Regions:
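Solvent-exposed helix-loop boundary motif
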Residues: 27-130, 139-140
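Bacterial N-terminal signal peptides that target proteins for export
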Residues: 1-10
């Protein structure tokens, strides 16, 4: 019984420690530096080439928006998860009212800007997500 209690206490401590190093506390980049190297074109944004690559580098990470963690109930690991799994995340052809855009711009009643801390997306990437949604949020 003592061993079981000790293991339970140790695992609880480990979980607490891991939660401190999770998505909300990633401040590894300098202010203004993007967590991704993806550069979006001004038009004809590709989900596969631009959007999902950006998400893989900046959002769909362990303890953030991957399939295992799905912080805030959102996984950004696939087109379906991004566009259809959570209503309102992407409002096709309406970036202004898409929760995804509100979150990356840090506006509206949606809570903190994402990615958190110093890991904000740069303006090109934010504009690229807006353009992708305005162009119909295609799976291309």
């Amino acid at each position: 019984m003592k061993l079981l209690l000790a293991l339970l206490a140790a695992s609880t401590s480990l979980i607490g420690l891991l939660s401190l190093t999770g998505c909300k506390d990633k401040n590894t980049l300098a202010p203004g530096e993007s967590p991704s190297t993806v550069v979006f074109p001004d038009r004809n944004v590709s989900y596969g080439v631009h959007v999902q690559t950006l998400f893989n580098q900046a959002c769909a990470l362990p303890m953030c928006h991957d399939d295992g963690s799905h912080a805030g109930g959102l996984s950004l690991t696939s087109y379906y998860n991004t566009v259809f799994a959570v209503p309102g995340i992407v409002v096709i052809k309406d970036p202004q009212n898409s929760i995804l855009v509100m979150k990356i711009e840090g506006r509206g009643p949606t809570g903190d800007r994402m990615p958190p801390g110093a890991n904000a997306l740069n303006q090109n990437q934010i504009n690229g997500i807006r353009t992708w949604i305005a162009e119909g949020a295609q799976n291309n």
